Amino acid sequence: MDEILYNDNVMIVNDEETSGDVNNQQLISNETIANIQTRLKQLQVSSDSDLEDYINARKMLIEMLNARKEYIPDVLSSLSVERLKSIDLIVQKLNSCEHSIIEHANILDQLQNEITSLKTENEYIVRLNDINAKKAKLFDDFNAKYEDDVGPLYVYAASEDVRQAAIYLSYMMRMIITFENETIESNFIVSDSLYIGDTILNVTISTDLQLGNRTVNVTMDDISESFVILEREYIELYLTRHVHKILNNTISYSTALVIFKRTVEDISIPSQIVNTVLFQQQISNSVTVKDVSKSLVCDFKIDAETELYILLPTIIPDSYSMDILGNQEFMLYLSDLYAFNLLQEILDVLYIDQLEKGLENEDNRAIEQLTLQNAQSIRYILNTLQYVPLYKPYDILIENGILNSIEYAAPLMYIKNEYISKNITRTSDKYTTDRVIGAHVLSGSNMDSLPNTAFKQKLFMNTQSVLTQENPIYEDTDIIIYAVCVISREYDDTICGSGYTYTTSNMYANRSEFIRMNGCIADSVPVKTSTIVKCTYSLIDANRIGLLYNKTRTNIKINQILICFKNSFAVPTSLNVAMDVKIQCLKKTETLSVTQAKPSQILLENGISYFGIICDISFSSDYVFDGNESINFTLQPNTNISGKKELVMYGRQGGGMQISDMFQHKQDSFEYSIKVGLVCNSTQIGMGQWFEIFSTLIQGEFIGNIDTLRESTIRGISNIYDFTDVREFLHEYKISIVKLSIQCLRAMSAGVQDVIVAYSHALSNIDALILDITVEMNDFSNRLTTLEDKVKDIEKWIQNQIDSQNTTIWGSLLDTFVNLIIATALGYATAGIGVLVTKISVAVLSFTSRALTSIARGLQAAGHKVSTLFKLHITQPFLNGAHSLKLLTQKFNAVQGNLTKYERKYITALELSEANNYAAIAKYLKNLNPEIKLAEAINHKLVYSSRYVNPVFKLGNEVMSTVEINYHGLTAIGKLPQLRTPTKKLLSSDFGTTLMKKNKAPAHAYMVITDVDARSEYDLVTKYILGVSEGFTSTTKHVTAGSFKLQYEFRKHPTTNKTTVSFSTYQDTGYTAEEVKLLFNRYFKNRTNITNANQQWELLSSKFMSLQTSTLNSQRFVLPTSHRTTALYEAFKNTRRFDYNLLTNNCQNFCQDSLNWLENGVINGSLIQHSDQLAIKYVNALRGDLSLI
């Protein structure tokens, strides 16, 4: 069958077998064909319907042309060339449209499937968005009501979503009723939208004037109890409710009313529990869902002095002041705050519930796809988190001791054998014995000069040595513990010894010759090349030799135990360390306890840096050779050594002359024994043993080069006892951990660079560091190579969907996944969230290398964002009720010095009441909220570091360093910074927010760094003031950057507990009177009447002691270590020129760059030109911690 290609790609069949069929089709007229052709010419493809008509007409034409092939020449002959070309173009367009239709049909089918899938999956997305929207609205409503940014506390709004959630909540309300004044009827209403149904708690009071007491009647539902209240007594009521969901959309709950009767001392704070009455009412009946949103109204008809306190399940803002609101307003405020927190927990439960349902659906891919779309933002958060101090509890307890203690090197004597011929000395191998420690002795054999001259000088060749060792004594996956041992020896300037006394007359006659040479004639007989000269020798017994030695003192001190945390990048906080160690060394065994423990960055001798704890102990042991002990030894060759040996020498030619060579070849090895004795009883030196005189033999080996250039009577072996590097010789001493207990908060990294944090960037070899990073990144790359292309395809597809749809649903879920990442990084994720983040990790890790470049910027951006959004701090995260205590003490106007007294009593009362299991509610509910946990993690150290203002709140060594950036208004834009009182606008929160987002505000910025050293007697607070135009500025020709410091001592009175503050003198701080004058003139221009340096220093100290009300204070940042603070201060202690530019390099840039250095150790921007000084000062600061060891 032949095929002829027509110009519109139509195939005309030319087959003889079909001719009959064609003839049967000749009834089709030419007119019909012409009409179809006309239709094709006129047809314009402008719509889907036209296109369909065109296709159908074309198909008909093809069929007819195949049936009427004999008419084709007639049709073509009637068409012009131009028309034929036009038809060709139409046909080409037709073909193109056909291909497009096929492609679009496939795409439309794909999109239809995707839309169908998304329609199903968006069921969960819409719910999650709805919950987030409610949170945002509730937060705005609360702020609008109280005009106070207190954090993510939300008002409840009835929603179908709430009814779908599984709720497991317990909460309580506490009322304190006192009767110190006359009875006045008062009415307090507390609304809690979480209570189900209407429950009335009535508290009424009746007074018996004759008996002088009062009766309190408490009624709730069918419960009715009465209490007789005597003078100085009061009652506490705890109304608790546990709500949980059951099947069929019904809710059951249990209610408990707990009443405590207490007595009052000086003020109305619980001091002890006198009588306790506990009764409960259990309600099991079903309550319909529609009652969820009803609220409880409690009418209290009680005295005006009654105080109502609600124990919040989460937190109370630190910024709250009792002076802002009155008594009744305060009650309402706490009530709202309480309700907002609880409702927020419900929304969080709902949120996690919807996530888990979405993940359980195998066909649901929407959450993963949305996560990939937001991968860049999530990576940014992850990289930021790796420098955020995410604190986690760390706890270790060892009570039975560590049996496998490590044995370490200790200083020992060794014998250095020298063969001496004339004045030529060849040194052989060294031999050791652990029988004597620290002696420096020398025999009298082969002395070339008189005693007490060169002999004495040789004794003093090595008279002083100090060695520091960091010996590991414990290691696991989290920590490694080192004992810092300092080994030293000192020599007296006199020579001691009770052995043989040498004089000029007997020095050579009584030498202890070890090798006797016989018949050596090498220097008297000329020899030719290759002439063999032989010399024989024999071994002889050495005489008994008395030893001389310096009076020597060997001392070993162990003053510090270093507890180093692995993979931690900031110092730990909330320390509670107890440690007992048993040390056996130098005839001394002692068990010691750690006397003090402080957090610090630790730099080991090998250059590796850790963050950890330095523990102080005190151990010292000595041994002294004082001349009262006599040491003797003899040398004796073993009997298996032949009597005579032969040395061979070959002549050689040099310079045209035949000269003889020395016998310097290793000819033989000789074994000999050394008998050592010590005139004393056997005793322990650590785990070593001292032997009695001549009690044992020590095997040694002599391999020496014998010089026989000429015969001489001055031959033999000089045997020297000396002290060598302790690393070469092992001696057993032990440090055993008897008991170890560590409780603290440990800073962990949430990023992907944990392996890098153990390096000291200033000290480690940069090539090795780069290699380690490269290996790590290659590992990531190898694991993700096969996934990266797929991830890119998915991201591209999602982006196309975003571009093609008019919706905000994709972008609105960013916060959702950020919260998930944060929750997982903090370790509080549920199983569902864990699965989700596992799916996310492919997208996150595949872009890790690119995202690393944004770490520095991410730190500040995320740190500020979180700190600003969540102004919530946990004063004591492991102590229930600490915030309530703070508010109580403020409410009752307790004096500052007495806070700790009532603090202890209140805590005791809480502990006694923990039997009802409601005291732990706050801990359980707090763990459900990832935002709160992140805020707590970032601001934890901030809370502790702020205690320097009020040291009575300090509960240990968790006081940390902080830095804050303050702002003053400028006199004129573009001029040098001059301080003035800022306007109200400058102090406004809105302006402050704008100021933190930009670096070009009309304000001068400077830094105040506060470092607190918690000592046993007092707290030493050091403030560093740093910035452009700060410090000792004496000229205005150039802009400079400088720093200075002030110090304060906070002391607590042992009996009154009142705290006093004193200023360190300028002399103790390290300044001169002239420097004080420069500083004073800088900050007190108008106080020219004060010229005394002491008075000037006191005014400067007062100015910077606390926050200045005339400045805008930014959010404080907590510093992981104080070493970079010291480096920054030292670098700018002497003012340095600063190339000031208002737009690109101003005072605010300098502060931000300095902050980046303090927090991250990254030098950029305005600090680059000072990088060498900062690095040097930083290393010196690290080394400084070890200098006192």
Swiss-Prot record:
Domain of life: Viruses
ATP-binding found in the keyword field: no
Domain PPPDE: 981-1187
Cellular component GO terms held in the UniProt record: viral outer capsid
Compartments, as annotated in UniProt: Virion
Molecular-function annotations in GO: peptidase activity
Principal cellular location given in the protein's record: virion
Active site: H1004, C1147
PROSITE patterns named in the record: PPPDE (PS51858)
Keywords: Capsid protein, Outer capsid protein, Virion
UniProt keyword Mitochondrion, yes or no: no
Name the record gives this protein: Putative structural protein VP1
Protein's gene: S1
